[in-house]
Amino acid sequence: FKAKYLSESIDSILNQTMSDFELIIVNDQSPDDIDSIVFSFNDSRIQYDINEKNIGGTDLILNWNKCCQKAVGDYLILASDDDVYSPDFLDEVSCLLERFPKVSLVPGRVRSINEEGAEVEKDHLFPIYMPQDDFLYYASRGMISVQAQYVYNREKFMKRGGFINFPFAWNSDAATAYMMSDGGVLSTPSIVFTFRKSSIHITGDGSIKKQDSEIDC
């Protein structure tokens, strides 16, 4: 939905060292010039869709789930329009899933930055594998939880109805992560995801409007 950091976000996804994925970008009738940004990337992995009308302004979770329904791969990520992935994000996640193929949830370790790009905080180092109870323990004691850091097993995610729909999407991402954690959780040892704290972010201004893209690998 927002154009300010979109190019940087797309670039971080396309520059993954693991190249076997599809990037689905959904324009939720943004007033910004999203088209020009997307069309500046000449990459066959991009699928660009435009909603017929704005959905996220009235039901953010409905828009998230409609985005996820476009995925066809084994795993999915619902990326945002202002966060950044390290080049080895997908490689680190893939290596963990090869070791623990029955796990359906992998959060990438997070750091947060401000609008100028300066680091604000970074998450602690957690065990590579956590049973659900341990994941809940760490989550209740300050583990950073951001929707776009999570990799989901797509089949399990869709069978369970996708993101849990709470009013204004508050804590929907955390509740969905817990729902998906019953088979355990994997955590990358390296910081591979950068969350931008911004005045135009959903957590910054209270707006429920937010455009979401998706990686499907």
Spans of model-derived segments:
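Short aromatic/hydrophobic "clamp" motif used to bind/position activated sugar donors
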Residues: 76
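Conserved donor NDP-sugar-binding/catalytic core segment of glycosyltransferases
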Residues: 88-121
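The conserved acidic donor/metal-binding loop of glycosyltransferases
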Residues: 80-84, 109
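A conserved acidic beta->alpha catalytic loop
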Residues: 27-36, 53, 80
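Conserved nucleotide-sugar donor-binding catalytic segment
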Residues: 130-212
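Short, acidic, metal-binding catalytic loop of nucleotide-sugar glycosyltransferases
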Residues: 11-20
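Glycine-rich, basic loop-to-helix element that forms the pyrophosphate-binding segment
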Residues: 52-71, 84
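Conserved short acidic donor-positioning loop in nucleotide-sugar-dependent glycosyltransferases
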Residues: 13, 28-30, 41, 55
